[in-house]
Each structure stands twice: as structure tokens, then as C-alpha cells.
Amino acid sequence: MTGSDLILTTALTVLGAVIGLIVRWRLATLAYRRDDEVTQPSPGPRWWVPAAVAAASGLLAWRFGVDRWPLLLPTLPLAWFGPWLSAIDLDVRRLPNRLLAAHGVVVAVGVGAAALITGDLSIAIQAAVGGMVAFVVFWILDRVRPGGLGWGDGKYIPIIGAAAWARCCF
């Protein structure tokens, strides 16, 4: 790890902590709950969200480093949105469509930007294939064991697949 890698890792860890605190604040409003979910007990303070976002952001920065920083563009949104969606799913067993759509757009923009910056179209191709493969695997699992995963998961899995596969062969 070079000095530049250490600076990038530290900066993205701190940025992740700040984003995690903002996410935790947004979660505390319980704005994601529907009318029929308002009476459910409070999920608690969710102290783990800023720690999870910071750790995931720092680990991704450490993994890719300065040399491969464009690959952070499609993968960092997983660190930022993942704990947020997990906290909501743990509370109401549902993934909000608007948050999934925002996450999908951010990942798609990140994939496109990484492909343009590096001049490597294979990043976008790998992301598209990864998203499709992840969805097909989900679809098969849903047919084998119906009810094990919801369609919120089905909408989220291609996003994860696209972000993860965007960097698989770089």
C-alpha cells in the first residue's frame, strides 16, 4: 500500500462514516414506513449503520487503491446503500422501490463513468452480464423455494450483480 492508497482509504473511510451518520439520521425518521407499519415497535438506534458504511467504504478503497480508483465508482454505492437497505429490511421486511431505483441509477452511472474513464467497455459489459446472471440465479431460487426471497430482493440482486461484476476482470 502506497502513501496515496492510505490517503484514499482514510478519506473514503471518513466519507463513509459521514454518509453512515446521515443514513442513520434518515432511518431514525422512520419515513420509509407505510401507514400499516407505523405502529410497529421502534427498531432502535442502529449504531451499526455508520460503522458498516465506513468499514465497507474503507475496505473497497483499500482493495482497489489509487491505481484502480475508477472501479470504486460502481462499487462504493454498495457500501453506501447496502446498510441503509439492510436496516429497512430488518425493520419492515421490505425494500423501498424509490431507494432501490436511486441505488440502481447510481450504480449504472458509476459503471458508465468507470468504463469511460478507463476506456474499457468490458466494465459495462461485465456489469450487464453480472446483473443478468444474478437475476437469473434469483429467479431459479425463487422457483425452487417460493417465498424465500421477496421481489424487493429480486430488484436488488441485479444491482448487486452489476456492481460486483463491473470489476471482476479488471
Name each region found by the language model.
Residues 1-170:
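A membrane-topology feature that recognizes alpha-helical transmembrane segments
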